[in-house]
């Protein structure tokens, strides 16, 4: 299973991200959507699960949940992802809760790390550039044994 992951679009869905998400079985947006039409465009590619970020507290995106649990099963052992916008607001023990991964955004800084057997993954931002950070999104591939491989995908953008 292939999962496309993005965050911090801030009302800008760059056309360069769409080919990177093509072929995804599911897409996760980790908050700061901005324009809800972005979710519709993503849904044309694959089913979408989205959460609200700190810029989504008013308007149509305010209806998005603050956190979400996504459980996926297939020809592999079940995997469970915990989605939240800001990892500093994590108020549970992901290992004790049985999560395979904690997926988050907010900082615009891509990150892949493991702690106590749990993947912590921030795809970075594929919206407006912040400081000198790269423009990125992410991908998770789950193999037939339930192993999770996370990748940061850099968009081909110079400016």
What is the meaning of each model-derived region?
Residues 1, 25, 46, 79, ...:
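A structural micro-motif
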Residues 1-48, 56-65, 71, 133-136, ...:
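N-terminal active-site segment of His-dependent metallophosphoesterases
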Residues 5-7, 26-32, 49-54, 82-85, ...:
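Active-site neighborhood of phospho(di)ester-bond hydrolases with catalytic His/Asp-centered motifs
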Residues 11, 35, 88, 109, ...:
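Short active-site segment of divalent metal-dependent hydrolases/proteases
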Residues 49-89, 96-98:
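Helix-adjacent hinge/juxtasegments
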Residues 57-58, 110-112, 129:
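Short gly/pro/ser/thr-enriched loop/turn and capping motifs at secondary-structure boundaries
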Residues 69-77, 97, 114, 121-159:
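Binuclear metal-dependent phosphoesterase catalytic core
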Residues 87, 91-97, 102-111, 115:
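Non-DNA-binding regulatory cores of transcription-related proteins
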